[in-house]
């Protein structure tokens, strides 16, 4: 089936892409063109000297006389082509054999004679490895070149960015105002000075911040105040406990005592507000009570406090046991001497009574007294007698009277102002008395059958009638009489009192010195102050620490109240025993208290050291523990001692002073009032709100804490003096034999001990308050820690600011340098020496084009090499014969040596080689102008190889700019136009038909040849006509002159020269224009400048003159080495057209 196709489609089929030719389609196309233009019958006349028409060396030579054979040109063409094809087939077969490694059996079979198949196999392997190495090197070179292109692209972008920045800076610099710069410099100086001052302030602030103590070393006034005076601490204040009270009597003598001498009742006036100290010989009930309180304290506060309490109680018991043993020994030794002294004391009783009648009567004031079990007993209780008539019973001998020592602190009288002296329910042992109501009650008698004893239900109030000062002479006569009668039976004078002159009555006592006492809460209405009394005169329960007492046994055995006391049996032995017991108890108490005072001082020092060594987070707990235990190592609610409890300076007595004492003495009354300054300070400290008030309160409390060691030392000394004074008074009483002096002395000693107990109680209260306040300081440490963190953050900010200031100092501009730069004017001469941007871009573009052309060549060579290798392997696998390898190997080695030498040495021709001398390359001729002998070089050696370059390929747009691609396209069009012109010029010579894969006329179609190429080291002789070409001639004067051998065809020759120089080297166009466009080196380096124009292609001088002048601002571009070196002899023989023919492969 036939079909039609256009010539355009047939061209696309014949040449589908660059480097690919379909010869059958091309043959059909050419045949169609010849038929269309009707030249199929035209003939071409050949000279017969064409290279491709020459026969092979093994041509038949006719003998002499034979007719010369007629040579058929087509047959000759077929013979040449067949030879080439046969050789290529042999090469392919040889290459196939070389690629396949022979087996061992094949090697053994072929190893005969001169054949060495093993060596040949080894050589083949080495050739393959070399080819692979070359491929790897080429790939690496390609990658390196691509990296270089990428770097150049980045450099180009950087240059553009720098240029933009320079333009911007230049624009800004043009707009800079010198006056503004001067003002800016002044501002910078001012800011620099300010920064210097700020830096100094920052350094000062840093020093201050470093001087701030650590959080654990700081205590705020408000935190210390809350820790010392918080409401929670008020609940922990010490209250008087029942531990101080006892239902038992003083320990008796180990000797036997009669029943009637069990108790001797002596009323003793006292003004102390707290009970006496507990006896050393405590019972099991008291120990149980102490342990119970320790357990309760451990449950409510801390286990450490209870443990300390128990340990102190055990130590106290051991001290009591040792002291009791010592006392028994001492009592046994001193019993005889005491008996004698008491006998003398009985004799002086009557004398004392007579003196007591004439002595002035001291007016007592209300005050506290110790009860029967060492608890405060106050005024007459309601229900016992009416408040308006508290008269002394007339019939004291009756059996239904109330015991006066149980009524209250004053004796009953007829009015509210009747003085009522205190009577202890458990009286101290003293001398015997004839007063009936002082006799002891029988055993089992119940006191106060209608009264319940209550503990903490008493409020501190002033009773009516005792709020105003009352002089002695203003008292009612009835009351005075009653009191006088009472004083006849009770010794009231003779013992010195603190603050009261000896033997002098106290006539007036202000109401401020009246101590407060307690009344039942439900009965306060009976003792309210009168309306005309100011509120300040009325005591409240907040003015003194709350006293906590244990409830005692209630006596309600009414049937026994009417029993009359049995008559007391008198006996000096029982009185002596009781006195001995009392003296021993007092001495033991003084010794025990002195021992405990020493241990308390040591414990206080240990507590201070423990508080100093404890960590900050446990400071509050440790301080509270130590403060609650007290300086004596135990709790104050059962020890009861202190400077503020009424302890005063000691009053030493010697024997001379004691002898001068009168036998009659005033009532042992030493009123104790709580310190109003201390109470008011505690109240104001608890109610403080402002920081200044808290600071003052804390300072006041800390001042008392600082005085504790000195007060303990003073207490120790005072107890020593008291013990000495007690011994002196006891000796005096024993010598004098006065029962009144002995009772007064014991009463004074008891009063001082009670005062010491109260002082101790107040100190313990302060210590507990301070301990609880220290416990709350822990919460303030957190606030302080947060404040320190904020300070640390500010310090970091200050450090950053300092670093910025230092950086500004380093990078700040210098005004002098700026002024010099601003005042400096642009120098045109220096600007002329700088590079021009247009020139720089031009040079960069030329370099880019040169590099891309090199890359294009390398790519083309690589593809051609791969294709040639592929075809060779394919053809050798199918056509090569093993027996022809030896001759082919030699031919290949020769070709390889030549090609490698040309590639490495740049196709240089060495006239001194052995081949040059053998072929006599130089001929002796004479110069046409001066007849001087000249050596003329013969024609160059021609080399014909397979073409591997093909047409130029356009690189992708990603690797090259658009301008370069456009120039490359223009260059290819010009080259194509040159080829067309050259083909038309040669067209008149005629050519033969070329069918199939036969040879072609390379003179007319050399731009289409892609298989074979001929190399001319000194240029293509067909492109240069030496008769009409312009040559350089060396004259006699040594100057080179330009000229032609003939003036004909000058213009056409020039055109041919211009067309031939398209792909020449930039600096040597007269050497590169000799290379054929279709040869291996045809696509040479492109010109660096697109504006380059060449007017002469034969000399270096003409090429230099026609090159575009470079701008003066650019340095000369370094020239690449010439591909073909210039001949050392610049003279060429004109007119010689004789050339050597190129050898065939």
Curated annotation (Swiss-Prot):
Database matches in InterPro entries: DUF4795
Composition bias type Low complexity, residue spans: 1100-1111
Region spans: Disordered: 489-577, 1100-1145
Natural source organism: Mus musculus
Compositional bias annotation for Basic and acidic residues: 504-569
Compositional bias per record (Pro residues), positions renumbered to this chain: 1112-1124
Record's keyword terms, sorted: Coiled coil
One Pfam family linked to the record: DUF4795
Coiled-coil intervals, chain numbering: 74-101, 186-212, 744-816
Protein name per Swiss-Prot or TrEMBL: Uncharacterized protein C16orf96 homolog
